Design a protein with these regions (language model features):
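Beta-propeller-forming repeat regions
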Residues: 1-398
Length: 398
């Protein structure tokens, strides 16, 4: 557990024997987070094992560069600056800075993890050297020139205005990883098409990497895609049966006048969680492997909303992930995987009554007791009743 303030990173040392717990300074740092006192705590991934040596490194954005503190085997950290500037946005009376998305992948097949950023039409790769530091100059890899690093609503025109929603065709990178199990990084892209505020379609495209003369290359056309007649969102990846190929989980919902009116009257909106898998040619199927309906709730009076729990974990230790999802405010269901290729999931679900958090988005899935089955830890938040705020719910698979 680490804590960042204006000038330092602190590490939490738990109590042990006669020693009390304490916060100790781990490193003096500089970053663009310059506030003297924060109004609230925020979770950030500024501690990473960047060079995959098993040691905690520090990564913090500054206004004009990215600051790294790389750990060595003796406990020291070595600083390095990379020319990765924060993104600046200027309005009439304010200026804001956002850090760039950083991806960690081996981009030249040398067994070392490299740092990757995206700009329109290309990847910028900071290769890791033999001394575990990174090159100060980026190697550029061309990708489809319509692929962006930013969402369409973050892109401003020459006059400073946002994009016209009556005519949007926009691709943005959502993930860089090896999806088809060939040890070569691939690119997942969200493709948004819009002819109006209520007339949007969102698909996901996948550009598989290939080696040509020893160098990483991406084609102009997507290798495969996940599509639906409804709007897709919440792209996540999982290896359902541990075969090295990633399945895709997306949420699907319909946006229209009738759906909006119905949601306002009922205080909830139905959405489907769809799981797509690859075939033997690394193509995603047109139909999902499985579809599960869940419900999202909201309150116009309080301004709060409730997100459903929907995750895939192996709860019975058979090395195949099962589906776990919430059903209302006090029920959790589990659909077990089956060995049947035509019907990969059971038709009925297991049920358990528990007081579900309104927003279980930060649910932790880990094998807590080492029995080979994945357990579930749920946290309550501000949308839940006051008596639940100090509780943590631990569900052990059995």
């Amino acid at each position: 557990l680490y804590l960042l303030d204006k000038a330092a990173v602190h590490r939490y040392v738990p109590a042990h024997l006669s020693h009390k717990s304490a916060w100790v300074q781990a490193e003096s740092v500089s970053s663009m987070y310059l506030g003297e006192q924060a109004d609230s705590l925020r979770k950030m991934d500024f501690i990473q094992d960047i060079n995959r040596d098993g040691l905690d490194d520090i990564m913090l954005p500054h206004f004009e560069h990215l600051n790294l503190w790389l750990s060595d085997c003796c406990g020291a950290r070595h600083p390095q600056n990379l020319p990765i500037a924060a993104r600046i946005e200027m309005n009439q009376s304010s200026v804001s800075y956002d850090d760039q998305e950083i991806y960690f992948q081996d981009m030249n097949s040398d067994g070392k993890t490299d740092l990757v950023t995206v700009e329109q039409g290309q990847l910028n790769v900071f290769l890791q050297n033999d001394d575990m530091r990174f090159s100060d100059t980026a190697t550029k890899i061309k990708i489809n020139k319509t692929i962006h690093a930013l969402n369409w609503w973050d892109i401003k025109g020459e006059n400073g205005q946002e994009m016209d929603q009556s005519n949007i065709q926009h691709r943005v990178v959502r993930e860089i990883d090896d999806f088809n199990g060939d040890a070569i990084p691939d690119i997942a892209v969200q493709f948004t098409k819009s002819s109006g505020v209520l007339d949007k379609t969102i698909d996901f495209e996948f550009f598989y990497g290939a080696l040509k003369e020893g160098k990483l290359h991406y084609s102009e056309q997507a290798s495969t895609s996940v599509t639906s007649e409804e709007t897709l969102s919440d792209l996540t990846f999982l290896d359902r049966d541990m075969d090295g190929k990633q399945e895709v989980s997306v949420s699907s919902f319909d946006i229209g006048i009738s759906q909006i009116v119905g949601a306002l009257l009922s205080g909830s909106i139905d959405q489907d969680v769809l799981i797509f898998s690859m075939d033997e040619n690394d193509k995603f199927g047109k139909a999902p492997l499985v579809s599960q309906e869940v419900e999202m709730t909201f309150s116009l009076s309080s301004g709060t909303q409730g997100q459903p729990l929907a995750t895939m974990i192996d709860i019975n230790g058979d090395a195949v992930k099962d589906i776990v999802f919430s059903d209302g405010e006090d029920l959790i269901r589990t659909v077990l995987a089956t060995p049947d290729q035509k019907n990969p999931y059971a038709k009925s679900s297991l049920r358990q009554k528990i007081p579900m958090p309104k927003n279980p988005y930060d649910a932790v899935t880990e094998d807590i007791n080492g029995d080979g089955k994945t357990d579930l830890v749920l946290h309550y938040g501000s949308a839940d009743s006051p008596e639940l705020l100090k509780r943590v719910l631990v569900l052990l698979a059995n």
